[in-house]
Amino acid sequence: MAAEARVSRWYFGGLASCGAACCTHPLDLLKVHLQTQQEVKLRMTGMALRVVRTDGILALYSGLSASLCRQMTYSLTRFAIYETVRDRVAKGSQGPLPFHEKVLLGSVSGLAGGFVGTPADLVNVRMQNDVKLPQGQRRNYAHALDGLYRVAREEGLRRLFSGATMASSRGALVTVGQLSCYDQAKQLVLSTGYLSDNIFTHFVASFIAGGCATFLCQPLDVLKTRLMNSKGEYQGVFHCAVETAKLGPLAFYKGLVPAGIRLIPHTVLTFVFLEQLRKNFGIKVPS
């Protein structure tokens, strides 16, 4: 009798990403604060101390509902497309996809996920940035759904997709860095014969993937955050890039350290959770 393997269900990526987001949300919030500074005034530790001192420890979880909403749109979409297509194509070809096909599939999945997740991403950035604004300038969204409703009512439906081009481009890059590079790294690690398909292998492969994703998407991440948090002062992506460049070339990598500190653990946790979901609750298929 043939041994049985398991493949992920289409929604496992969204669930795993939500679990990871709950663990890394404070780092994501600090990253947004650092990126939206007009001048480099505070580093990561200083920003964390200021947030806690001003609004309390729970302020580090400001916007968590929007972050979870984003994961259940953006991450669920890209994981569902990538894993469903990859598993079906690989099943027909009797072997893993070549790396260039993984990159292409990751790009398409990320573009779709980035577009679908733009409204939740917009609200997520605003809710995280709210705690550093003066009381009179805060938007004070009660939760993610309230934020989505108020943006649509007060600013129009088009505003919900402000920065969609940038979010989709960033989604493509981070998905290539995470999903495509994770698959390839895991394949290479297993091919050495020194490690089996266990949690340590998942950790090593996802750590590599997190580093790749951070390197690829940081410049776009800075521009996306500035566009979404703007009040109309930028005419588009190019104008935002020009204005950011005036602050110096390193402005595109503002918040790089907290971005890496946040994205690498987030990537590791996402894939560890995903692999455990697949192993214990995945769909059984003949191996």
From Swiss-Prot:
Catalytic reaction list: (S)-malate(in) + phosphate(out) = (S)-malate(out) + phosphate(in); malonate(out) + (S)-malate(in) = malonate(in) + (S)-malate(out); (S)-malate(in) + succinate(out) = (S)-malate(out) + succinate(in); (S)-malate(in) + sulfate(out) = (S)-malate(out) + sulfate(in)
GO molecular function: antiporter activity; dicarboxylic acid transmembrane transporter activity; malate transmembrane transporter activity; oxaloacetate transmembrane transporter activity; succinate transmembrane transporter activity; sulfate transmembrane transporter activity; thiosulfate transmembrane transporter activity
Compartments where found: Mitochondrion inner membrane
Any one GO biological process: gluconeogenesis
Gene3D superfamilies according to UniProt: Mitochondrial carrier domain
Tissues expressing the protein: Present in high amounts in liver and kidney, and at lower levels in all the other tissues analyzed.
Membrane topology: Multi-pass membrane protein
Pfam families to which the protein is assigned, alphabetical: Mito_carr
Protein name: Mitochondrial dicarboxylate carrier
Organism: Homo sapiens
Gene this protein is translated from: SLC25A10
